[in-house]
């Protein structure tokens, strides 16, 4: 009889940390959690701090906090002043010099929230990658979540990087986002941009597909239980599918003449439409950062200028855009001291 005596191989600190991070718990941490949880906490905490008591008087000449009388729809963490350029406005940097009050006044919370928010979103996408790998499924959830990340990064970071300063990014607030949308329309004619059109088609098309898919599945559910409603009538461990793909295929074949032939193609299409739309809108925003123009119908503008009786919806929208610029520039950028003489203000052909 032979007895072998040996030592268990020693485990390094990396293996110990890896086991602890991936331990089965109520809220999974994982390696992605090292990025996600601190960044999400700091971004949300910075936004709540700014909207509670930090003013935008020094950066925009506005009241933007609950302390100043704003409400949930009008509070915001505002962008720094135009004069700050693209400075990260670190608390210990040359602008604030470690003074927390001065840091708030200069708009230092905005880059703080924007950068931690971006890394928090990336951490959440990596979390979906990590958990998908651990449970043995494909990582398409993470791929889908890349679309809103692309929109966030393009709007809040890449667009102002293409402009003169962070000042031209959207502030973090509901009414502030609306102001930014008006800005994009007035200065970039964004609604006529083909990338915006693809984004709208993707988002609304995705919503339509989601509604149609949910209704079709509900219509073709098998009645395999005696529960009082849909949510009690099915056993979550049943081996067979809960709805009839064949019946759904026959229904839509009669409605449109065509239908999805299998579930894989159907669900890939539901993934493809909104994700592609959001990615295209993000590409369009990068184009706006570079001040690229799209769909300027100059021939119509020239004819409208020469012929008082000629006007199209396009030329009318161009006049509206000029009105937005003439109104918004002095209001939104008072530091530039813009003065527009009466004769340059836009007027429709009917006036």
Curated annotation (Swiss-Prot):
Protein name: Photosystem II D2 protein
Organism (species): Nostoc punctiforme (strain ATCC 29133 / PCC 73102)
Location, primary (coarse class): membrane
Assembly information from the UniProt record: PSII is composed of 1 copy each of membrane proteins PsbA, PsbB, PsbC, PsbD, PsbE, PsbF, PsbH, PsbI, PsbJ, PsbK, PsbL, PsbM, PsbT, PsbX, PsbY, PsbZ, Psb30/Ycf12, peripheral proteins PsbO, CyanoQ (PsbQ), PsbU, PsbV and a large number of cofactors. It forms dimeric complexes.
Reactions the enzyme catalyzes: 2 a plastoquinone + 4 hnu + 2 H2O = 2 a plastoquinol + O2
Compartment(s): Cellular thylakoid membrane
Positions contributing to a plastoquinone binding: 213, 260
Gene that encodes the chain: psbD1
Record's cofactor remark: The D1/D2 heterodimer binds P680, chlorophylls that are the primary electron donor of PSII, and subsequent electron acceptors. It shares a non-heme iron and each subunit binds pheophytin, quinone, additional chlorophylls, carotenoids and lipids. There is also a Cl(-1) ion associated with D1 and D2, which is required for oxygen evolution. The PSII complex binds additional chlorophylls, carotenoids and specific lipids.
Protein family according to the UniProt entry: Belongs to the reaction center PufL/M/PsbA/D family.
InterPro entries in UniProt: D1/D2 (IPR055266), Photo_II_D1/D2_sf (IPR036854), Photo_RC_L/M (IPR000484), Photo_RC_L/M_CS (IPR055265), PSII_PsbD/D2 (IPR005868)
Short name of any one Pfam family annotated for the protein: Photo_RC
Record EC number: 1.10.3.9
Membrane-related topology note: Multi-pass membrane protein
GO terms, molecular function: chlorophyll binding; electron transporter, transferring electrons within the cyclic electron transport pathway of photosynthesis activity; iron ion binding; oxygen evolving activity
């Amino acid at each position: 009889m032979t007895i072998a005596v040996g030592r268990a191989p020693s485990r390094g600190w990396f293996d110990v940390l890896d086991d602890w991070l991936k331990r089965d718990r109520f809220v999974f941490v994982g390696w992605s959690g090292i990025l996600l949880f601190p960044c999400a906490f700091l971004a949300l905490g910075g936004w709540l701090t700014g909207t509670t008591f930090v003013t935008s008087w020094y950066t925009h000449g506005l009241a933007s906090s609950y302390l100043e009388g704003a409400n949930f729809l009008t509070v915001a963490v505002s962008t720094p002043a135009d004069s700050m350029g693209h400075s990260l406005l670190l608390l210990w940097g040359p602008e604030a010099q470690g003074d927390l009050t001065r840091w708030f006044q200069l708009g230092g919370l905005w880059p703080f929230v924007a950068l931690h928010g971006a890394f928090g979103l990336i951490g959440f996408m990596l979390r979906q990658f990590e958990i998908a790998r651990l449970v043995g499924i494909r990582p398409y959830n993470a791929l889908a979540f890349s679309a809103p990340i692309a929109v966030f990064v393009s709007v809040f970071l890449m667009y102002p990087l293409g402009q003169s300063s962070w000042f031209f990014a959207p502030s973090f607030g509901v009414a502030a986002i609306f102001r930014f949308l008006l800005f994009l329309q007035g200065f970039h004619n964004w609604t006529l941009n083909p990338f915006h059109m693809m984004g709208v088609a993707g988002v609304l098309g995705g919503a339509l597909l989601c509604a149609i898919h949910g209704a079709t599945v509900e219509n073709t559910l098998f009645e395999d239980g005696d529960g009082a409603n849909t949510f009690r009538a099915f056993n979550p461990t049943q081996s067979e599918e809960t709805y009839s793909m064949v019946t759904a295929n026959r229904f839509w074949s009669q409605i449109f003449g065509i239908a999805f032939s299998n579930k894989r193609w159907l669900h890939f299409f539901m993934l493809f439409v909104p994700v592609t739309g959001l990615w295209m809108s993000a590409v369009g925003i990068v184009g706006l950062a570079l001040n690229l123009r799209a769909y300027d119908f100059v021939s119509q503008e020239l004819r409208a200028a020469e012929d008082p009786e000629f006007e199209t919806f396009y030329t009318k929208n161009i006049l509206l855009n000029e009105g937005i610029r003439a109104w918004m520039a002095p209001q939104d950028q008072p530091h530039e001291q813009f003065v527009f003489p009466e004769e340059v203000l836009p007027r429709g052909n009917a006036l």
